C-alpha cells in the first residue's frame, strides 16, 4: 500500500503545534508519517527542535528552511497574509536566518531537502543553493 507523509504548512488546516498534535494523535503511525518543515514551524512561533524530538519516529522527511525573523515580525505586526510574508522574504535557506539547526541535525538523521521559498528575482537561486550547501557541509560534514 501507500503510506502518507503529511506536510504541515502555514496557510493550511494543519500548520501549528496543536494542529499537528491533533493530526498525529488521530492517525495511525503505520499509515501516516510527518514531513517536518523547520521554516513553517518556526514561522508559527513554535520550537522546531521540540517537535522533531516529539515525532522523530514518525518523521520520514524534513524540509530544511530558515526564516528571517524581522520579516515574520513585520508580517504579523501588520496582519499581512502568509503569502505576503513569502513575497517579502520571510523564508531563506538554512544558515541565513535564525533557526539553530545543530540540535535538529543531532536528533533527525533521515531524508532532508533544502527549501527556501524565495523570489528568484530577489535571491539568486544558485547563490543561495551554494550558501545552503556550504552551511550543511560545515554543520554535518556531509
PLM regions and their residue ranges:
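Catalytic P-loop NTPase motifs of RecA-like helicase/translocase cores
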Residues: 12, 41-42
Amino acid at each position: 500500500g501507500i503510506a502518507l507523509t503529511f506536510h504541515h504548512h502555514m496557510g493550511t488546516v494543519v500548520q501549528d503545534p496543536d494542529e499537528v498534535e491533533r493530526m498525529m494523535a488521530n492517525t495511525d503511525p503505520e499509515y501516516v508519517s510527518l514531513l517536518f518543515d523547520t521554516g513553517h514551524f518556526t514561522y508559527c512561533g513554535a520550537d522546531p527542535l521540540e517537535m522533531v524530538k516529539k515525532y522523530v519516529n514518525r518523521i520520514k522527511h524534513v524540509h530544511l528552511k530558515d526564516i528571517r525573523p524581522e520579516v515574520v515580525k513585520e508580517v504579523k505586526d501588520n496582519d499581512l497574509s502568509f503569502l505576503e510574508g513569502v513575497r517579502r522574504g520571510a523564508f531563506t535557506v538554512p544558515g541565513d536566518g535564525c533557526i539553530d539547526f545543530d540540535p535538529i541535525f543531532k536528533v533527525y538523521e533521515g531524508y532532508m531537502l533544502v527549501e527556501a521559498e524565495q523570489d528568484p528575482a530577489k535571491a539568486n537561486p544558485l547563490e543561495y543553493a551554494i550558501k545552503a550547501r556550504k552551511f550543511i557541509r560545515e554543520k554535518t560534514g556531509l
